[in-house]
């Protein structure tokens, strides 16, 4: 059995340390108040047994809480008092050196929490370690100085989650839609160098990757770019290649027709498109930003964005090449084609491509083939977006999420024109819904009273995020605020006007709707008798956001939180505060946002239909998924799910497995098994358990994770049932 030390390191459980600690406290009291060695032994054994029942590695703090409980249960109150005093004294010593232990454990690569915090960061790499070290300092400053203590305590206790506190000390925002069109058409500046409008498609792709890297280094969340903004440069290259071909034939004195010139030019153009798309794919997965990871970037593929038919056809060529290259994958260090995590791809389903026989149907079939093998693209329904994302003029709009799932709300600028690219999200604070339910003890009046208190806590925490950005000078991130990614402000100008009036959003996240409803009603939120209560909770949070928006002129919106590592933290906090409650706190994870519980038997179509009503009530962003087996030999079923998505839900994805064992070459599913009280990954063919010698890709929270996960998320992945 393992335990987690305060610095995040994972070590073996040692019962003698508990015995020694209790004995020291025991020897410091009068003899009449002392416990016997047998009693001390029993306490230590009780703690050991309780730790074993947790089915995860307990923390030192949790073990000490157990020790206190059992000492007092034995009636040894004087011993307990001395034990608590000693513990408090040691805590004061540690607080005087708040970050040293954690930073040292990061450098020595024995911090288990850091290793499993982010499934797309490799904590062994120097650049990632530097980011984690900076994050520890930022988190420490934020918790000791910058944030109100009640918000810090609520975050520590898992009552709320103040996202990305390791970046809070700096004036950074969350995620955005990069205005690539403006930057390519009007030029931009990268690290002091003027980048003018590109004169070819290949150059435009290269510039786009440089922009992506710069943007990622100046924010902590995801970003999205649209292939539509690259499409005009296909015609630029076409004209350039035609002129070159004509010149070549003129030089050698050979007479050719325009059709012959066009035929040769199109072949060369296809090769340039291939190279340009390859540049984006390989640059994105090989670049390391200042965040110590590849850019969290989403590539949006929407034929309906094209300005004319020629641009739409050229966009179709880019989309086709993007899908072909993603289907192929990238090679790992063994030279085997595997699934890359980035860029995330989103394909928009629309009337031009969703019906068999429609103009771009072949593209949709290729997308289905790619999804079945590589888990992307994910799918957005133009039909549902136009129906549900309606601006104040009554017009519906289809546009990408910012990175993983965070959606902007509809917005019309001062000229009455819709605007999406160049807008951003200020930050997220998530409320732990099961904690509200458990704190109420099942009393509905108390539940809503506590809900109000938690909403106000989140409100204040979100305003902290907002105030941290307020007054930020455009000079803090020129690529974002001065050179087009988000705006073209003057040097020395603040970004304040972009924080109000709906230009940017700020998100109230929520997690564990299933567990919350389960505790309050005794039933899953899919049960017809419990669904109205679940929807009432959703509406309650939306009402709070509307109230705050009117009060501050800031666009608060409700967001279905993708808990990656936080799912484990929330679960541990709930177990610590309320114990193990069957169906509510008996897992090492809690359910993302409104999702159907991963163990619940439900078919893909019923799941998407059920979750669609909750997605509509999450205007700040949400995504639904269905878990499927290997579908490469059943593409018709994939297409059937895609057609259902088009007609029923805004945004959804299909999850499958994509693994490879570098020891024996196994390319089926890598198993999750329990060993010494810990979940590990093991090749079913050769038994390899070395994570450095296997490639495992799983959907974590909208993105594909490839660097493994903490114990909570790993248990959630293990317990997922298939929906097809």
Each language-model region and where it sits:
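Short amphipathic alpha-helical segments with coiled-coil-like heptad repeat character
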Residues: 15-19, 75-78, 307-315, 521-524, ...
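Amphipathic, well-packed alpha-helical segments that form the structural scaffold of globular domains
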Residues: 23, 459, 463, 514-518
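Conserved catalytic cores of very large enzyme subunits
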Residues: 89-502, 523, 527-689, 695
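Long insertion/accessory domains within large nucleic-acid-processing enzymes
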Residues: 685-724
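Contiguous, well-ordered alpha-helical segments that form the cores/surfaces of helical PPI scaffolds
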Residues: 301, 506-519, 539, 699
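Metallocofactor- and cofactor-centric catalytic cores in central/energy metabolism, strongly enriched
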Residues: 273-277, 281, 519, 713-719
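Charged, amphipathic alpha-helical regulatory modules used
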Residues: 1-109, 718-723
């Amino acid at each position: 059995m393992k335990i987690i030390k305060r610095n995040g390191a994972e070590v073996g459980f040692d019962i003698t340390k508990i015995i020694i600690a209790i004995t020291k406290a025991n020897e410091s009291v009068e003899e009449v108040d002392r416990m016997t060695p047998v009693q001390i032994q029993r306490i230590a054994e009780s703690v050991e047994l309780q730790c074993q029942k947790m089915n995860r590695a307990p923390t030192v703090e949790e073990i000490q809480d157990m020790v206190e409980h059992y000492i007092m249960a034995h009636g040894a109150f004087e011993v307990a008092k001395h034990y608590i005093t000693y513990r408090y004294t040691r805590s004061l010593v540690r607080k005087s050196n708040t970050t040293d232990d954690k930073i040292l454990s990061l450098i020595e690569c024995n911090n288990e929490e850091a290793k499993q915090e982010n499934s797309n960061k490799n904590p062994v790499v120097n650049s990632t370690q530097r980011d984690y070290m900076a994050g520890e300092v930022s988190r420490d400053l934020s918790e000791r100085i910058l944030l109100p203590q009640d918000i810090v305590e609520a975050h520590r206790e898992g009552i709320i989650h103040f996202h990305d506190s390791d970046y809070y000390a700096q004036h950074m925002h969350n995620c955005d839609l990069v205005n690539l069109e403006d930057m390519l058409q009007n030029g931009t500046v990268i690290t002091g160098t003027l980048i003018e409008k590109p004169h070819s498609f290949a150059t435009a792709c290269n510039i786009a990757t440089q922009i992506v890297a710069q943007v990622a280094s100046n924010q902590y969340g995801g970003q999205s770019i649209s292939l539509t903004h690259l499409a005009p440069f296909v015609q630029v290259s076409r004209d350039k290649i035609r002129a070159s071909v004509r010149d070549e034939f003129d030089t050698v004195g050979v007479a050719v027709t325009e059709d012959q010139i066009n035929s040769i030019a199109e072949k060369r153009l296809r090769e340039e498109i291939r190279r340009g798309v390859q540049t984006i794919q390989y640059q994105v997965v090989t670049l390391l930003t200042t965040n110590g990871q590849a850019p969290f970037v989403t590539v949006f593929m929407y034929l309906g964005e094209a300005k004319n038919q020629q641009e739409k056809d050229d966009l179709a060529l880019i989309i086709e090449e993007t899908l072909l290259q993603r289907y192929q994958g990238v090679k790992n260090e063994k030279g085997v084609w595997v699934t890359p995590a980035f860029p995330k791809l989103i394909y928009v389903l629309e009337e031009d491509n969703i019906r068999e026989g429609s103009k771009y149907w072949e593209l949709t079939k290729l997308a289905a083939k790619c999804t079945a093998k590589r888990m992307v693209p994910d799918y957005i329904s133009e039909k549902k977006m136009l129906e549900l994302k309606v601006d104040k003029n009554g017009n519906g709009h289809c546009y990408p999420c910012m990175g993983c799932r965070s959606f902007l709300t509809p917005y019309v600028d001062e000229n009455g024109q819709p605007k999406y690219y160049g807008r951003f999200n200020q930050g997220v604070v998530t409320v732990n819904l099961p904690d509200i339910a458990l704190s109420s003890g099942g009393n509905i009046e108390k539940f809503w009273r506590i809900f109000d208190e938690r909403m106000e806590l989140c409100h204040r925490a979100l305003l902290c995020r907002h105030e941290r950005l307020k007054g930020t000078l455009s000079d803090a991130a020129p690529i974002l605020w001065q050179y087009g990614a988000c705006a073209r402000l003057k040097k020395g100008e603040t970004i304040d006007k972009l924080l109000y009036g709906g230009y940017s959003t700020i998100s109230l996240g929520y997690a564990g709707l299933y567990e919350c409803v389960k505790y309050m009603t005794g039933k899953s939120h899919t049960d017809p008798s419990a669904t109205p209560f679940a929807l009432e909770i959703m509406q309650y949070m939306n009402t709070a956001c509307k109230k705050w928006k009117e009060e501050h002129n800031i666009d608060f919106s409700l967001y279905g939180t993708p808990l990656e590592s936080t799912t484990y933290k929330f679960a541990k906090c709930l177990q610590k505060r309320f114990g193990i409650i069957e169906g509510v706190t008996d897992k090492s994870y809690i359910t993302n946002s409104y999702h159907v519980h991963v163990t619940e038997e439900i078919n893909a179509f019923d799941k998407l239909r059920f979750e669609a009503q909750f997605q509509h009530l999450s205007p700040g962003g949400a995504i639904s998924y269905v878990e499927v087996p290997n579908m490469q030999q059943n593409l018709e079923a994939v297409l059937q799910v895609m057609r259902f998505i088009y007609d029923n839900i805004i945004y959804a994805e299909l999850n499958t497995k994509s693994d490879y064992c570098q020891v024996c070459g196994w390319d089926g599913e890598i198993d999750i098994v329990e060993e010494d009280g810990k979940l590990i990954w093991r090749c079913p063919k050769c038994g390899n358990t070395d994570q450095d010698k296997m490639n495992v890709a799983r959907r974590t929270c909208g993105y594909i994770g490839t660097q493994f996960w903490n114990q909570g998320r790993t248990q959630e992945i293990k317990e997922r049932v298939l929906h097809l």
